[in-house]
């Protein structure tokens, strides 16, 4: 008989409770996933009571308040605070999103914050993005041309050619979509996932790129591309309102056209 076991330190336990001593006008409890691999202990869910009347409107504001005033060991990424850099991607209230643009008022009850699913956790809310970025590098996300670079101008593009990149170039590589995709959970070692495939199509669709055929040939692989089963979690969760599933469909259509289908 097979003996099934959970990996070491995989059971999430109840952690510390930090209660506010002063009277609060707008009390709210924030529950945060905590994990430090250096301690060789199970992850925990720590609870923090904060006064929303003394913090900003976004979830990131609450995290910064907790780190600055309650527990300085709380670890998370953040930078722009404008939904541009993608640093503060995490799972909030069951949905992958950006903490800096997620309004607290949209969340009912306790605010529950976890790191992005599927990825190895570096510490607390910080996921290891190494594999994700390696996959991004594999699609060669830069302009590949055969003609020499113009000496006195940039490579020009028509207005219509530029419009084809709308809904693609805005991707900030936050990984919210890829880590919400069950196909990526199951086959993340080979399947590129929605974020990387959207980025791949961004270069395929660029009228200035001369290597469309080569890019499509590289993606024509049972694992890299065709593990997409149109579950649509990617489109639902994208904090920028993009549609990775549509981009994946476009790639499949172009490959089919190359085979006369």
From Swiss-Prot:
<dbReference type="GO" id="GO:0008177">
    <property type="term" value="F:succinate dehydrogenase (quinone) activity"/>
</dbReference>
<feature type="binding site">
    <location>
        <position position="228"/>
    </location>
    <ligand>
        <name>[3Fe-4S] cluster</name>
    </ligand>
</feature>
<dbReference type="GO" id="GO:0046872">
    <property type="term" value="F:metal ion binding"/>
</dbReference>
<dbReference type="InterPro" id="IPR017896">
    <property type="entry name" value="4Fe4S_Fe-S-bd"/>
</dbReference>
<keyword id="KW-0479">Metal-binding</keyword>
<feature type="binding site">
    <location>
        <position position="80"/>
    </location>
    <ligand>
        <name>[2Fe-2S] cluster</name>
    </ligand>
</feature>
<feature type="binding site">
    <location>
        <position position="234"/>
    </location>
    <ligand>
        <name>[3Fe-4S] cluster</name>
    </ligand>
</feature>
<feature type="binding site">
    <location>
        <position position="186"/>
    </location>
    <ligand>
        <name>a ubiquinone</name>
    </ligand>
</feature>
<dbReference type="InterPro" id="IPR050573">
    <property type="entry name" value="SDH/FRD_Iron-Sulfur"/>
</dbReference>
<keyword id="KW-0560">Oxidoreductase</keyword>
<dbReference type="InterPro" id="IPR025192">
    <property type="entry name" value="Succ_DH/fum_Rdtase_N"/>
</dbReference>
<keyword id="KW-0816">Tricarboxylic acid cycle</keyword>
<feature type="binding site">
    <location>
        <position position="171"/>
    </location>
    <ligand>
        <name>[4Fe-4S] cluster</name>
    </ligand>
</feature>
<dbReference type="InterPro" id="IPR001041">
    <property type="entry name" value="2Fe-2S_ferredoxin-type"/>
</dbReference>
<dbReference type="InterPro" id="IPR006058">
    <property type="entry name" value="2Fe2S_fd_BS"/>
</dbReference>
<keyword id="KW-0411">Iron-sulfur</keyword>
<comment type="pathway">
    <text>Carbohydrate metabolism; tricarboxylic acid cycle; fumarate from succinate (bacterial route): step 1/1.</text>
</comment>
<keyword id="KW-0408">Iron</keyword>
<dbReference type="InterPro" id="IPR004489">
    <property type="entry name" value="Succ_DH/fum_Rdtase_Fe-S"/>
</dbReference>
<keyword id="KW-0004">4Fe-4S</keyword>
<dbReference type="GO" id="GO:0051537">
    <property type="term" value="F:2 iron, 2 sulfur cluster binding"/>
</dbReference>
<keyword id="KW-0249">Electron transport</keyword>
<dbReference type="Pfam" id="PF13534">
    <property type="entry name" value="Fer4_17"/>
</dbReference>
<feature type="binding site">
    <location>
        <position position="238"/>
    </location>
    <ligand>
        <name>[4Fe-4S] cluster</name>
    </ligand>
</feature>
<keyword id="KW-0813">Transport</keyword>
<feature type="region of interest" description="Disordered">
    <location>
        <begin position="1"/>
        <end position="23"/>
    </location>
</feature>
<protein>
    <recommendedName>
        <fullName>Succinate dehydrogenase iron-sulfur subunit</fullName>
        <ecNumber>1.3.5.1</ecNumber>
    </recommendedName>
</protein>
<dbReference type="Pfam" id="PF13085">
    <property type="entry name" value="Fer2_3"/>
</dbReference>
<dbReference type="GO" id="GO:0022904">
    <property type="term" value="P:respiratory electron transport chain"/>
</dbReference>
<feature type="binding site">
    <location>
        <position position="181"/>
    </location>
    <ligand>
        <name>[3Fe-4S] cluster</name>
    </ligand>
</feature>
<dbReference type="GO" id="GO:0006099">
    <property type="term" value="P:tricarboxylic acid cycle"/>
</dbReference>
<comment type="similarity">
    <text>Belongs to the succinate dehydrogenase/fumarate reductase iron-sulfur protein family.</text>
</comment>
<keyword id="KW-0003">3Fe-4S</keyword>
<dbReference type="GO" id="GO:0051538">
    <property type="term" value="F:3 iron, 4 sulfur cluster binding"/>
</dbReference>
<feature type="binding site">
    <location>
        <position position="177"/>
    </location>
    <ligand>
        <name>[4Fe-4S] cluster</name>
    </ligand>
</feature>
<dbReference type="InterPro" id="IPR036010">
    <property type="entry name" value="2Fe-2S_ferredoxin-like_sf"/>
</dbReference>
<feature type="binding site">
    <location>
        <position position="100"/>
    </location>
    <ligand>
        <name>[2Fe-2S] cluster</name>
    </ligand>
</feature>
<feature type="binding site">
    <location>
        <position position="174"/>
    </location>
    <ligand>
        <name>[4Fe-4S] cluster</name>
    </ligand>
</feature>
<dbReference type="InterPro" id="IPR017900">
    <property type="entry name" value="4Fe4S_Fe_S_CS"/>
</dbReference>
<dbReference type="GO" id="GO:0009055">
    <property type="term" value="F:electron transfer activity"/>
</dbReference>
<keyword id="KW-0001">2Fe-2S</keyword>
<comment type="subunit">
    <text>Part of an enzyme complex containing four subunits: a flavoprotein, an iron-sulfur, cytochrome b-556, and a hydrophobic anchor protein.</text>
</comment>
């Amino acid at each position: 008989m097979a003996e099934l076991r959970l990996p070491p330190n995989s059971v999430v336990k109840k952690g510390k409770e930090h209660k506010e001593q002063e009277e609060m006008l707008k009390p709210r409890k924030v529950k945060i996933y905590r994990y430090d691999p250096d301690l060789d202990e199970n992850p925990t869910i720590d609870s923090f009571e904060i006064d929303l009347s003394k913090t900003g409107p976004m979830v990131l504001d609450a995290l910064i308040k907790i780190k600055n005033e309650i527990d300085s060991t709380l670890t998370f990424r953040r930078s722009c605070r404008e939904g541009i850099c993608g640093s503060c991607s995490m799972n909030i209230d069951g949905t992958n999103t950006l903490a800096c643009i997620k309004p607290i008022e949209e969340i009912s009850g306790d605010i529950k914050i976890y790191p992005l699913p599927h990825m190895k956790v570096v510490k607390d809310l910080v996921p290891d993005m190494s594999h994700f970025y390696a996959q991004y590098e594999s699609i060669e996300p830069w302009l590949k041309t055969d003609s020499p670079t113009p000496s006195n101008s940039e490579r020009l593009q028509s207005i219509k050619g530029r419009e084809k990149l709308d809904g693609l170039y805005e991707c900030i590589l936050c990984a919210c979509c890829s880590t919400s995709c069950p196909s990526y959970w199951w086959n993340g070692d080979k399947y590129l996932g929605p974020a990387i495939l959207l980025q791949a199509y961004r270069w395929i669709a660029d009228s200035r790129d001369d290597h469309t055929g080569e890019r499509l040939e590289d993606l024509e692989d049972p694992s890299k591309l065709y593990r997409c089963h149109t579950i649509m979690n990617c489109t639902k969760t994208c904090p920028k309102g993009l549609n990775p599933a549509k981009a994946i469909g476009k790639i499949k259509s172009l490959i089919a056209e190359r085979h006369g289908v």
